[in-house]
């Protein structure tokens, strides 16, 4: 292997990316990495093989990056669930409406270093940035729900450097640590008070989205323009450009001998640094400003690199500065966007296109170049968006085409002017009017969000790769060009300037890579189809609640919906996204009973699927269109499966635990018993006629009032699934239930530990899958379990 800077940086990047998938036991301690690297260097001295140096560098990089993960993981592991008086400083406010969620720094014990804590707080006095408080906090270890393909909150915690979660019980402010940024933020809040889009203006000025209302945020999310609100590369680049232009204007008044080409560059970076400071040097902001400073440094050093090499160096530098950056979705969005544009402009530059063999006029060129840029992002960035967000906005192309120029050249400069001039010349009011206009304009495209399943995402990715193949083949399909000025006419009006054609080998490599992506997508689809079970039962991780999904042939029956609360539900957070990711068509909804932890999301599910049949043991109205009652003796066949209702015997006005709808599902060979929260006295009745079953949904989340000795002696389940929340106040599952299940040699799966549990039924066997296993990445493991 030939040694050069780019090669070493690529090895550095690969070493850091191992943090995305390696489980905790495979992380390499820095001491071990150092020993291995020294041994490899020693071997190099004798063998003189360059690959040994590369390997030593790679191992040393592993030690450096893995140390960050191991250190943070150990801090999180040391947290014990307890109440503690803590003095903390507010670093970031995430949400500030009826309640506050924020990130603070604190020293939890005298012998520990300062840690970052995620806090939930319903404060009487609104907390502000940089304030120091002393509070009684109910601390606990990091934990999160985990469903297949869903959002991993633990990954988000670690990406933010958070090692503990707490709820503030009571607090007293003990100090105001004033900073210029905090003072400026309070000043701007007063200046913009009463403006309709105050939250948006503050977000664009300071990177603080705590005051951004849900309606506005929803508009930008559903139109693929949310990136305009997060201060990142686009905004820092704009600040750099503004500073550069201001410096050029100032240079007009300089004597010629004082005019230097580096002055505008340095001034632009300083201006960008000021904006980054106002934004609190958030992760996206830090990433952007670090990249900018690094590129400027390379320019000053007069080193020449291609755009792709520049990009590689910048990514390596960023990862070296923050090893946990790959855990952040924003990192992949930022790097993905830049990488997509580099590829697009490398192989399909706008300079290719002309009008009747002549360059476009400046105005036309500006408009068409925007179309060209947006189309490139649409083609390259769509696959990344599909896999990260499970969908895309059908009108996002047009929304960005209109919003990006207005934000870039009008709104952001106007907001910066307002910040630095304290709102002179009614600049805040003008910025608010402009923000209202563009928000109203793009809101026309709201509602065009298309949710995409994983399989469809693979198909669309293959389609994008195929379109790119056709573009490359169509543009460069002619024989080698003998004259550098030869123009090839392709249409009546638009022509192509191929004065700089792709080399044949490079063109072939691009086509091969595109075809490889297509082949990979269809291989994954084929593998999924061939390994598809006959039917499956999914117990979703919905915390302290229940949501079980029976799936066959892409159709589903949902048994319970988890809980709900003011402003949200598990149906919105977990169940609907899972159905959409998997492309499952819901046909029936069964509610075991009316308690919130089982039926809280019923209205949300029925709103999303208005044509499903609702089966319930009570007369309670959930706004359904078609309802039947759950009564013992009723049965039906669905997709070749037999459903038999065992309990209750009567319909009631409101169903509680004892009225739970108990259902036996079987395919003639395998059987599943769904018990809801049925109590032991109910089990004495419906278990009389039951024989051995394969899977038991353990009643009442593992409470000692259910899963009686009698039931287990009758059904003797091979697999017992408990749906519970890790921090539930009743400490379910009860030890007596666990003891009984183990005595009957049942394999016990608890969603509080395993996350989502899936049981796949094949013709000759059943197979259990967990969202969280011992092979899960280090950040997804159960943390602090040994201390409970």
Swiss-Prot record:
Alphabetized SMART domains for the sequence: Lactamase_B
A Pfam family matched by this chain, by name?
Answer: Lactamase_B
Q: Matching InterPro entries, A to Z?
A: ComA-like_MBL, ComEC_N, Competence_ComEC/Rec2, Competence_DNA_uptake, DUF4131, Metallo-B-lactamas, RibonucZ/Hydroxyglut_hydro
Determine the domain of life of the protein's source: Bacteria
Q: Which GO terms describe its biological process?
A: establishment of competence for transformation
Function statement:
Might contribute to transformation as a member of a membrane-bound pore complex at the base of the transformasome. It could directly interact with transforming DNA during translocation indirectly by participating in the assembly of the pore.
UniProt protein name: Recombination protein 2
The scientific name of the source species is Haemophilus influenzae (strain ATCC 51907 / DSM 11121 / KW20 / Rd)
């Amino acid at each position: 292997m030939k040694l050069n800077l780019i090669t070493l940086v690529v090895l550095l990047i690969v070493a850091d990316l191992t943090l995305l998938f390696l489980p905790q036991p495979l992380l390499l301690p820095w001491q071990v990495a150092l020993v291995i690297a020294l041994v490899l260097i020693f071997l190099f001295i004798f063998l003189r093989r360059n690959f040994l140096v590369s390997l030593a560098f790679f191992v040393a990089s592993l030690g450096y990056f893995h140390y960050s993960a191991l250190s943070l993981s150990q801090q999180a592991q040391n947290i014990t669930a307890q109440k503690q008086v803590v003095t903390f400083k507010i670093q970031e406010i995430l949400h500030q409406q009826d309640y506050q969620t924020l990130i603070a720094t604190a020293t939890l014990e005298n012998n520990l270093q300062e840690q970052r804590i995620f806090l939930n707080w319903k404060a009487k006095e609104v907390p502000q940035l940089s304030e120091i408080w002393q509070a009684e906090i109910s601390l606990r270890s990091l934990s999160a729900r985990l469903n297949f393909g869903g959002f991993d909150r633990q990954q988000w915690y670690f990406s933010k450097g958070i090692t503990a979660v707490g709820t503030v019980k009571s607090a007293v402010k003990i100090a105001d640590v004033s900073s210029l940024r905090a003072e400026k933020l309070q000043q701007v809040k007063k200046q913009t008070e009463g403006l309709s889009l105050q939250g948006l203006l503050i977000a664009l000025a300071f990177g603080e989205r705590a005051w951004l209302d849900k309606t506005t945020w929803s508009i930008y999310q559903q139109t693929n323009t949310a990136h305009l609100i997060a201060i990142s590369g686009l905004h820092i680049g704009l600040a750099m450009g503004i500073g550069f232009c201001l410096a050029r204007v100032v240079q007009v008044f300089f004597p010629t001998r004082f005019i230097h080409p580096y002055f505008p560059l340095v001034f632009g970076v300083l201006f960008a640094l000021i904006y980054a400071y106002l934004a609190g040097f958030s992760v996206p902001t830090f990433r952007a400003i670090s990249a900018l400073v690094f590129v400027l440094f390379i320019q000053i050093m007069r080193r020449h690199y291609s755009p792709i090499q520049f990009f590689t160096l910048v990514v390596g530098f960023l990862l070296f500065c923050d090893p946990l950056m790959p855990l952040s979705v924003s990192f992949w969005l930022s790097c993905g966007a830049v990488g997509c544009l580099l590829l697009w402009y490398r192989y399909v530059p706008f300079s290719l296109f002309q009008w009747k063999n002549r360059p476009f006029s400046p105005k036309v060129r500006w408009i068409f170049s925007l179309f060209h840029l947006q189309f490139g992002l649409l083609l390259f960035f769509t696959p990344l968006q599909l896999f990260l967000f499970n969908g895309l906005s059908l009108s996002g192309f047009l929304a960005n085409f209109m919003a990006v120029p207005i934000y870039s050249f009008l709104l952001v400069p106007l907001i910066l002017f307002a910040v630095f001039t304290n709102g002179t010349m009614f600049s805040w009011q003008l910025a608010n009017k402009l923000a209202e206009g563009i928000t109203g304009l793009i809101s026309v495209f709201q509602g065009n969000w298309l949710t995409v399943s994983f399989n469809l995402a693979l198909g669309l990715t293959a389609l994008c790769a195929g379109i790119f193949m056709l573009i490359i083949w169509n543009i460069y399909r002619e024989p080698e060009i003998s004259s550098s000025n030869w123009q090839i006419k392709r249409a009546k009006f638009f022509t192509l300037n191929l004065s700089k054609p792709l080399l044949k080998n490079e063109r072939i490599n691009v086509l091969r890579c595109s075809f490889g992506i297509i082949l990979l997508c269809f291989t994954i689809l084929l593998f999924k189809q061939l390994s598809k079970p006959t039917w499956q039962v999914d117990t979703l991780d919905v915390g302290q609640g229940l949501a079980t999904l029976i799936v066959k042939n892409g159709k589903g029956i949902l048994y319970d919906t988890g809980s709900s609360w003011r402003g949200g539900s598990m149906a919105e957070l977990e169940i609907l996204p899972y159905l959409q990711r998997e492309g499952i068509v819901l046909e029936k909804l069964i509610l075991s009973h009316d308690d919130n932890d089982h039926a809280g999301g019923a209205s949300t599910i029925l709103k999303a699927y208005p044509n499903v049949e609702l089966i319930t043991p009570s007369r309670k109205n959930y706004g359904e269109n078609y309802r039947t009652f759950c009564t013992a003796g009723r049965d039906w066949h669905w997709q070749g499966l037999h459903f038999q209702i065992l309990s209750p015997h009567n319909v009631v006005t409101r169903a509680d635990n004892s009225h739970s709808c108990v259902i036996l599902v079987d395919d003639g060979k395998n059987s599943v018993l769904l018990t809801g929260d049925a109590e032991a006295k109910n089990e004495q009745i419906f278990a009389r006629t039951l024989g051995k079953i394969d899977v038991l949904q353990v009643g009442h989340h593992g409470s000692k009032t259910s899963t009686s000795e009698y039931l287990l002696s009758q059904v003797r389940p091979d697999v017992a699934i408990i749906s519970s929340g890790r921090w539930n106040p009743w400490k379910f599952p009860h030890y007596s239930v666990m003891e009984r299940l183990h005595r009957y040699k049942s394999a016990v799966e608890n969603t509080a530990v395993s996350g989502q549990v899936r049981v796949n039924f094949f013709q000759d066997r059943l197979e259990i899958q967990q969202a969280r296993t011992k092979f899960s990445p280090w950040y997804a493991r159960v943390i602090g379990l040994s201390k409970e």
